Structures are given as C-alpha cells and as structure tokens.
Amino acid sequence: MKTPTLGQLATENGAQVVGDPDLAVVGLAPLDQAGPGDLSFLSNPLYLPQALASAAGAVIVSPADLERIRADGQAEGRNWLVARNPYVCFARVAQRFDRAANADSRTGIDPRASVAPDAVVPASCFIGPNVVIESGARLGERVRILANAFIGASAEIGEDTLIYANVSVYHRCVIGARNILHSGAVIGADGFGFAPDIGPTGVEYVKIPQVGRAVLGNDVEIGANTAVDRGAMADTVIEDGCKIDNQVQIAHNVHVGAHTVIAGTAAVSGSTKIGRFCVIGGAANFSGHLNIADRTTVSGGTSITKSITKPGGHYTSVFPFTSHGEWERNAAIVRGLSKLRERVVQLERRQRGENNAPAQNKQDEEKSS
C-alpha cells in the first residue's frame, strides 16, 4: 500500500488538516512513543501537555482542543488533524493501516481440510488446514476460515466474515456478514436445559433437546472462548453491531439488541433480553427471563436480578475496593445491620412514647423499612 498523506486521511475521515497536508503518515503510535512519521491522537484534554510534548508528526484533535492549543500559542509549526471525534477518527485510520498490514489474499481450500460435497464454498473464500465443513453449510463471498475450525451441517456464514482457528459453529446456526469470531469461540452449543424428575431416591435431570439456533447479525465480533448457546425452541439472537469480549457466556434464548457491547467474563442467563446500545461491564451477571431497557449501562461485577424498564440508566452493585482491614470492619458492620435496625425501631418508639403500644409495632417497622 502506498503511504497515505495527512491530507488523504483527512479526506477519508471527514477531518481537516491544520499544517502540512502532504505529510507522509507511516504509522500510528501513542503520544509518548510517536516519531516524526507517526500519527497520534488526543481524546482527553487532560493529556494536552503530552500532546504538546509529543514528537508525533501529527496529532488528531477535536476543534475545542485545537482552540485551547491556539490560545496557548502552541499550534504553529505543527500538524493537526481536526476531527469531531478524535477517538473514532483514530479507530478508522487504524483500521486502514491494519487492513494493509494484514491483507490476506489467499483463496481456495487447503488439501487438509474436509469439506462436504454439497457445502457451498465460493471460490473467493479461504479454507485453512484441518477445517471441517459439514453437509449443507453455505458460505458467502470472501469468507476466511482458519485452521481447525468447525462449521456444522446447514450452518450459514455471511460474506467477508473472518473465523479464526479453533472456532466451532454448530449445525444450522447463522453468522451474518463481516463478523469476526476469535479463537475458541463456540456458537450454538446446547443450552443448559434440564427438567427435574423428582423420584423417591432424589432428583434426576432429564435433558431438554435444544432445537433452536444461535443467530448472529452483521458486523458482530465475538471474543476468544466466548459461548453463545443455541435456543431451546426459539433462537438465541445477537443483533447487528454487537461486540462481545472474551469468555462471555450467552445462555439459550437470550436476545442482545443491536450495537450493545459486553465486556469479558460477563454472563447472561437464559431468556433474558438486553436492549440496544447497552454497555455491560466485565464480570456482570444477569438472572434469567429479564428485560433490560435500551442504552442501559451496567458496571463491572454487577448482579442484575430484576428487569430494568427505564432506558439510559446506569447501575452498579459492587463496593469500591479498600484495604483488607477496612473491608473486614465494613463487613462486620454489614453483618450487624439487622440488629442495628431493631435498635433504631425501638428508639423511635421510645421517642414517640409508644413503648406500651404493641398493636403499633408492625406499622412502626413497616414505616422504618
């Protein structure tokens, strides 16, 4: 790829150059590591001193930050790429460089792969060594499936999707266009469905066949070792644009709305519906059969046990960390809260002169709770 100029990058990303539009941009780097040929970015005004001290050939900034730099008299003699959202601009420029560095023009089927005779594999696809594609599977144009991946019977893979090594896509599952499935991801394994049969000697669990599918929309990314289970009867659905991190558990019949992001080790129990544009922190967990409103933010480690109906809320259930000794003292206080409440109720009764009014006890407790 020919080295792009700052002016070309501005045109591609709807940005404006202040400085030399002919500057050749050879790479991207953080502010403190960038050199004269590198492009860096400033997305937080707190790092303005680092931007001014950087040796970067150019820095992506917002219009407001450029005005601050000009007010300090330090804009002249440097190159700035002015974008409405510097972080997004940086991401798109990074995609450009990543495509060039990792361009994979390979096509065809590796002789060590096993592809069913009736599977549909366009000539533009690349199928790596030891890949297994079962009967009836259908691939779109330019799909790339790397070593040791498994595509089950009658599965569908959309165009321009990249499936890394050791991914498993079970039978009849649907993967949309431009998806990225990272190594170890499992799409469409059986959901955790069992019917308890209580007998005289105990409980036996009878397996419920999971006959639904896992269906992923377009532009979805699934992290390493993440599991998206197939539905029990209806489908498990991940809508367009969702980004799911590593080691996340999506249980059967879950529905995740478009452009929701879920960080690592989160777990969503069966039949829960998460809305659009939600942000789910790492290690958050959801009980089953809940409805989560659009644009909900859930902090890392939070346990959601009830539905959230109001859009745009931010929810947290984890105490910030403290020293171990302080945590132990706080834990002791929490353990004593029920006794403390009883004492408060008694003191309130005394204050109102109600010590000898047992008929009011229940009402008093309800008012205090």
Swiss-Prot record:
Pathway the protein takes part in: Bacterial outer membrane biogenesis; LPS lipid A biosynthesis
GO cellular component assignments: membrane
Catalytic activity: a UDP-3-O-[(3R)-3-hydroxyacyl]-alpha-D-glucosamine + a (3R)-hydroxyacyl-[ACP] = a UDP-2-N,3-O-bis[(3R)-3-hydroxyacyl]-alpha-D-glucosamine + holo-[ACP] + H(+)
Keywords: Acyltransferase, Lipid A biosynthesis, Lipid biosynthesis, Lipid metabolism, Repeat, Transferase
GO molecular function, one term: N-acyltransferase activity
Gene3D superfamilies according to UniProt: Hexapeptide repeat proteins (2.160.10.10), MurE/MurF, N-terminal domain (3.40.1390.10)
Region (Disordered): 348-369
EC number, UniProt record: 2.3.1.191
A Gene Ontology biological process term: lipid A biosynthetic process
InterPro entries xref list: Hexapep (IPR001451), Hexapep_transf_CS (IPR018357), LpxD (IPR007691), Trimer_LpxA-like_sf (IPR011004), UDP_GlcNAc_AcTrfase_non-rep (IPR020573)
Enzyme class, broadest EC rank: transferase
Active site, renumbered: H252
A Pfam family: Hexapep
Family in the record: Belongs to the transferase hexapeptide repeat family. LpxD subfamily.
Subunit note: Homotrimer.
Function, in words: Catalyzes the N-acylation of UDP-3-O-acylglucosamine using 3-hydroxyacyl-ACP as the acyl donor. Is involved in the biosynthesis of lipid A, a phosphorylated glycolipid that anchors the lipopolysaccharide to the outer membrane of the cell.
UniProt protein name: UDP-3-O-acylglucosamine N-acyltransferase
Gene: lpxD
